[in-house]
A protein has these predicted regions:
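Cys/His-rich zinc-coordinating "finger" modules and their low-complexity flanking regions
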Residues: 1-478
């Protein structure tokens, strides 16, 4: 083997599976495309491995190119980049990396732990809980330890967004205190942890579009019950938001998320929809992990049924894989998608309200989109007076009055921030969210447009911005 420091087709070490940077030395065989990094080249390759928990017989190194599938992960080593071991007594082949895979793991997409199960040709094939493809019964899988009909491919179960790969065999279950966020006082009265100063009472079909739920930050359109403060303050929660669990396992994060109550002098950016919010957040408690979700994104689970599509939606693509949304065309990592027809929906569109009111229309406007639109079919936004392209973006429309509006024009660029909120930024500057109700709309200092949205931002120095994104861009350009 020749020591090389240039880029070759296989820059991954065949022993440890680590990728060698361009500047690193590696030993590379020009004949069989076999590579070793410097560290692994100094370690002798184990010709025999005995791991009775994985296989009852001794495994022997198989020093040949082969297209045989690994009996644990089911993958065929097309590029011959994995060391392969075999049992001389059984028809059993296994990658070196699969010999020490954990036997019991905790995953983000199921409530119970999963245990490794070897191939069983007499077992009925199930769909993988990650990629939703059939699991080949001739290879190993991870299945529920509590007997649920739930399983994953070995390779899918050990993705970094599904499991941390820690061996949990013999380890006690983690106990998270998932008590209610409120104390029930009876007769529809509660004391919620987010509002300990006053009691809150249940009201039916509350309607006031100028008031917002303190958890999800959506206005009240009279489509459900609310808990309202019994004193003079305007603290109100949707009934469903008051019942939010203290701890939540989100399907794309390996750590349980803890409910963090409202942001009174700050805001956060949701990891999935990327909108800013001053409402409740689900936050990862692990130090150094910056996962934060607003309550709307955190409520999404599989299968997800959305009014814009007839089939259930799942998250089937791996981490760092981005696909454009069929509605807004924005490329998002791990969006929701349809396994039947390929429809893709980003979290931003998935969490938009189905119906909204517009002050100049007596009817409810419905969120919609057109996958295919005629070139001669024109749509015009009544607020910004610009064209709408329904095959490139969603819109809110009244079918009776033929009113159409851009999503941002109706909701604003910061729909989960409320008028009257004061935010202290990381630079210790105070910015104020104010109602944008004057006849003369102010000009945004960043984009130079008249601010068309319901609320505007004013800094302590008097500068005006139409959104938090414009304010951040201004800071970046300083």
């Amino acid at each position: 083997m020749d020591p090389l420091n240039q880029q070759y087709p296989n820059s991954r070490c065949c022993s440890c599976q680590g990728y060698c940077p361009f500047s690193c030395l590696l030993y590379y065989c020009l004949v069989c495309d076999f590579a070793l990094d410097v560290i692994c080249s100094r370690k002798p390759i184990s010709l025999k491995i005995y791991n009775p928990k994985r296989h009852k017989h001794t495994l022997h190194y198989f020093p040949r190119k082969s297209t045989l599938a690994c009996d644990v992960c089911g993958l065929v080593d097309d590029d011959y980049s994995h060391l392969l071991y075999t049992c001389l007594l059984c028809d059993f082949f296994i990658h070196k990396r699969c010999i020490d895979l954990p036997y019991v793991i905790k995953v983000s997409r199921h409530n119970h732990r999963l245990a490794f199960t070897p191939s069983n040709p007499f077992k009925e094939s199930a769909d993988c809980g990650v990629c939703y493809r059939k699991i080949d019964i001739n290879f190993g899988e991870y299945s529920c330890v509590k007997g649920c009909v739930y399983a994953m491919h070995s390779r899918c179960a050990l993705q970094s967004d599904v499991s941390d790969g820690k061996e949990l065999e013999g380890e006690p279950e983690e106990a998270y205190k998932n008590t209610k966020m409120f104390e029930d006082k009876g007769d529809g009265v509660i004391l919620h942890e987010s509002h300990l100063c006053h009691l809150m009472k249940l009201e039916n079909q509350f309607h006031d579009e100028n008031k917002h739920c303190q958890a999800c930050m959506l206005p009240f359109y009279g489509d459900g019950n609310v808990y309202r403060c019994m004193q003079s303050c305007d603290f109100i929660l949707h009934e469903s938001c008051a019942y939010l669990p203290r701890v939540k396992q989100f399907m794309l994060h390996v750590h349980p998320l803890i409910l963090e109550l409202g942001y009174t002098t700050s805001c956060f950016r949701c990891r999935k929809c990327e909108r800013y919010s001053c409402g409740f957040a689900y936050v990862c408690p692990i130090e150094g992990c910056d996962w934060k979700l607003d309550t709307l994104c955190a409520s999404i689970c599989e299968p997800f049924n959305h009014y814009s599509h007839p089939h259930p939606l799942f998250i089937t693509c791996g981490e760092y894989t981005s696909i454009p949304c069929y509605i807004c065309r924005y490329r998002q990592e791990q969006p929701l998608d349809c396994v039947e027809c390929g429809f893709v929906l980003c979290f931003s569109c998935a969490t938009l309200p189905h119906k909204l009111r517009y002050k100049h229309d007596e009817h409810l406007l419905v969120f919609s989109y057109k996958e295919y639109a005629d070139d001669d079919e024109l749509y015009w936004c009544e607020i910004c007076e610009k064209d709408i392209f329904p095959h490139e973006e969603g819109l809110y429309a009244c079918n009776e009055c033929e009113v159409t509006l851009h999503v941002d024009c109706l909701l604003g660029r910061d729909p989960y921030m409320k008028s009257g909120q004061t935010v202290v930024t990381f630079g210790k500057e105070k910015i104020h969210y104010l109602p944008n109700t004057h006849l003369t709309r102010p000009i945004c200092k960043t984009c130079g447009r008249h601010c068309p949205y319901k609320i505007k931002i004013k800094t302590s120095s008097g500068d005006l911005f139409c959104s938090y994104a414009c304010y951040q861009e201004h800071l970046y350009n300083l």
